[in-house]
Amino acid sequence: MAEEKIPTVQDEKKLQALRMATEKIEKTFGKGAIMNMGANTVEDVSVIPSGSIGLDLALGVGGYPRGRIIEIYGPESSGKTTLAIHAIAEAQKAGGLAAIIDAEHAFDRTYAEKLGVNVDNLWIAQPDNGEQALEIAEQLIRSSAVDIIVIDSVAALTPKAEIEGEMGDNKVGLHARLMSQALRKMTGAISKSNTTCIFINQLREKIGVLFGNPETTTGGNALKFYASIRIDIRKSTPIKDGEEIMGHLTKVKVLKNKVAPPFRKAEFDIVFGEGISRSGEIIDLGVELDIIKKSGSWFSYGDTKLGQGREAAKEMIRDNEELAEELTEKIREAIRNKHS
């Protein structure tokens, strides 16, 4: 067994010099600019719930971490904006302030209200170009007043030079440079202000790729590096009521995660006009974890019959908030135990 090292005079001098340096750093840059990890126990990560039980658990910390950059990307109409709007609604439920930078100029007020967003307490900007969008986002972040900012989308952050140029002008690399410069400036401010910054991104196909995945996201590589979490979202099988399509089963995969293990997956229903189906998630996860019993077409929880058929069971849970909360907590506990 190695003997415990006794501090020497030289060590004491070093510690004294370090103390003086840290005091100077804190005086210049503020309290908490530098800290000893051994002297300060790392607190649990503060989060904003995603609006999906399964995704909260796949993220490993119960939601989107505060003070971090999140990238949500996927094909068109896969549920990217829906996922981001649910996060805004969850932040507002906890008393937080939210803002959306609508670079696509396509924000749907009615749909956001249906998903639980208080639009009267939502700040929205519809900028003319990418520089303006990112400048607005940076100023909101530096105010430390906003809990969550959604930028929809990276592909729509068109550089000013491209907008003012002629059709067909070659502006190679402008978009990537804009994103790289903005993220270098914003990252530190996001961390200090504890703001969750969600970038929605689109997929493109690389030309001439014969082997491997030809898909790539827009805006260069900067966002891939600066994002603490990257979520790939895809729509799967349609949800039908007879012949009418009511929504889609949606699959998400956490491809990058700096706060918990990556590569976890989640599935949930996105119903048109309603967003993520919480009751559907409770049924599916409950059956998977043996919390809800399925016998033939009947679903039951303990002595409570939930209904015959998935839709009837969903309706029963949707109409009983107390039961929904109880099942949600049991599901969270079961998955935590599974991952521990």
Swiss-Prot record:
Gene Ontology annotations of biological process type: DNA recombination; DNA repair; SOS response
GO cellular component: cytosol
Superkingdom per UniProt: Bacteria
Localization in the cell: Cytoplasm
Record InterPro entries: AAA+_ATPase, DNA_recomb/repair_RecA, DNA_recomb/repair_RecA_CS, P-loop_NTPase, RecA-like_C, RecA-like_N, RecA_ATP-bd, RecA_C_sf
CDD domains: RecA
Chain sites annotated for binding ATP: 74-81
Keywords for this protein: ATP-binding, Cytoplasm, DNA damage, DNA recombination, DNA repair, DNA-binding, Nucleotide-binding, SOS response
Entry-linked Pfam families: RecA, RecA_C
An MF annotation (GO) of this entry: ATP binding
Coiled coil: none
Function: Can catalyze the hydrolysis of ATP in the presence of single-stranded DNA, the ATP-dependent uptake of single-stranded DNA by duplex DNA, and the ATP-dependent hybridization of homologous single-stranded DNAs. It interacts with LexA causing its activation and leading to its autocatalytic cleavage.
Similarity comment text for this entry: Belongs to the RecA family.
The protein's name: Protein RecA
Organism: Porphyromonas gingivalis (strain ATCC BAA-308 / W83)
Gene name of the record: recA
